Amino acid sequence: MSGFYHKHFLKLLDFTPAELNSLLQLAAKLKADKKSGKEEAKLTGKNIALIFEKDSTRTRCSFEVAAYDQGARVTYLGPSGSQIGHKESIKDTARVLGRMYDGIQYRGYGQEIVETLAEYAGVPVWNGLTNEFHPTQLLADLLTMQEHLPGKAFNEMTLVYAGDARNNMGNSMLEAAALTGLDLRLVAPQACWPEAALVTECRAQAQQNGGNITLTEDVAKGVEGADFIYTDVWVSMGEAKEKWAERIALLRDYQVNSKMMQLTGNPEVKFLHCLPAFHDDQTTLGKKMAEEFGLHGGMEVTDEVFESAASIVFDQAENRMHTIKAVMVATLSKLNN
């Protein structure tokens, strides 16, 4: 793990394929050690700040449990718990927290915010999610894929992302494919494709590593032979209802359902989702979607697929913690370098 100590984790393309692979190997080891009761605390005495301008269940719990497992202490700064960007600049916040903490996690808005924190904090800064990238999620996804296709290299795997690919998930998947050589297919209406410049950059790297990146509106063509089908929510509570109708009309044909799974032609195809998922009407938003748009069986994924044996979403959720732990150990512990 040489080279990781005191390094930031802001986006995947900041790393080499070998570095990404070593992080995944460390995550797998830490997971095995935890389950066997042999985990060694390498972050004893470390203090970690968790800045959340956007709430999250999985990201917060993953960082907190990972830190506690490794002997570190955390301070949670929620959406109303800090003055960042309001009464105090990001630059000043970084310099204050950097004097008190050994590492800082940021989950919030623009990528420029986490980049500024990293520039001025003087300690490792980790991107828990920004509008542009979600690198910790992709680490968990890659570990989960390795676990479910043991013995297969990434450049022998086909990953399909169906839905709105313009977001941080689509961008981070492009970066993951660039580093691993995945056969990545973004199956989405053209209006929901990522920026062309990032696609071009990542496709060139993916091809050098034995993979490819394809963008298509054709569902049947896009999912053929897939090993994994991935999706994410189409709307959020913070958006105007007018956007809900527009987004649902645009993406309705890209819902992950049993027909899409069958179109892969792969009886072993697995379903991935970064969660939370609107697969039923048991949530406030899910109920609204069902009532207003007739999406009673699920929105971006049907309940049938979500609850099927093909669904490995809770393996993914668990792996958030193990991979985040690997990032913290690699960047904060001299014992691991």
UniProtKB/Swiss-Prot annotation:
MF-aspect GO terms: amino acid binding; ornithine carbamoyltransferase activity
Keywords: Amino-acid biosynthesis, Arginine biosynthesis, Cytoplasm, Transferase
PROSITE patterns in UniProt: CARBAMOYLTRANSFERASE
Claim: Amino-acid biosynthesis is one of the keywords in the record: yes
SUPFAM superfamilies: Aspartate/ornithine carbamoyltransferase (SSF53671)
Pathway involvement of the protein, from the record: Amino-acid biosynthesis; L-arginine biosynthesis; L-arginine from L-ornithine and carbamoyl phosphate: step 1/3
Leading EC class: transferase
UniProt-listed GO biological process terms: arginine biosynthetic process via ornithine; citrulline biosynthetic process; L-arginine biosynthetic process
Similarity-based family: Belongs to the aspartate/ornithine carbamoyltransferase superfamily. OTCase family.
Name of the protein in its database record: Ornithine carbamoyltransferase
